[in-house]
Amino acid sequence: NAASTEAYRAMHKYFGHLTPSQQNEYTGMFKGKNLILISAEAFSPYVISKELTPTLYKLTHEGFVFNNYYQPNWTMSTIGGEFANTTGIIPMWGVQGKTSYAYSKNVSMPISLAWQFRALGYDALAFHNHTYNYYGRDEYLENLGYDYSAIDKGLVLPSKLWPNSDLEMMEATVDSYIQNYVENGVNFHTYYMTVSGHCNYNWGGNAMSRKNREAAEAAYPNSSEAVQAYIACNLELEYALEYLMNALEAAGIADDTVIALSADHYPYAMVTDGEDYYNELTGLNDSEKDTSRYRNSLILWCGSMEEPVVVDTPCSSIDIVPT
């Protein structure tokens, strides 16, 4: 209709007068820094509190603060969000009969973070505290340029649980690449895919929920088991990040290191048996059809930042790699 046509004309005129640029005021801000990128299993901003998760609170309030960040429903469970986080490409079904991540395993991916950092002389490492070849992740991440370790592929954790501990993964991996940087000057880009926040969200089906049950029940005494168990298993991510931050600070390299973190997807398993426990967690009354359901937190933090930078521009997981 006439109104929409006029709107298109206005947009065309506006964009036509813009001068494209590959730079902005923050270009080069983190040049030469190490990068740790984390895809956090079923993470949600409603986990974060100053009292219960002080490390997550610090990372989300003292770096870049993204007020309109989203991790959409890519309809691919974990691997869809992970693909978006690690490539900046929209994950799709039906790419020559395959999903995007499956197709990508056999094509060149030169713009991945790992290959880009390798070209600068960085080590590019990836870790996952679950079975190494789930989703074909071994082929996918190695094709992106990572030296990849996971359960049954070089990563040994003291406990064998479901889900495994994010803290134990950090304890098993962090010291080696920090030491290599401090002693030999080898920069690192490290990628983590966590698992502690995985469903089920109850005391019987989640070892991390059981581990951290007391703290979650004390903080949320009037909440359902589903909400308490979800908070409890995500406390393991908090403890993992606390360990990581302490290690960086002890080595004196927090100022040299950028930490980025995004969910793979919102915790959709909290919608179960006809109950929407995610609404209980959030205090909202939305559904999976609502954009608000996919609003999340993006961490982009470096110890060298003297004050937070607030970003109100809407953005999503496909913006991480280009940024």
Question: Model-predicted segments: where are they?
Answer:
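Solvent-exposed soluble domains appended to multi-pass membrane proteins
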Residues: K13-T323
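N-terminal leader/targeting and pre-domain segments
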Residues: R9-M11
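Conserved ABC ATPase "signature" region
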Residues: S4-A7
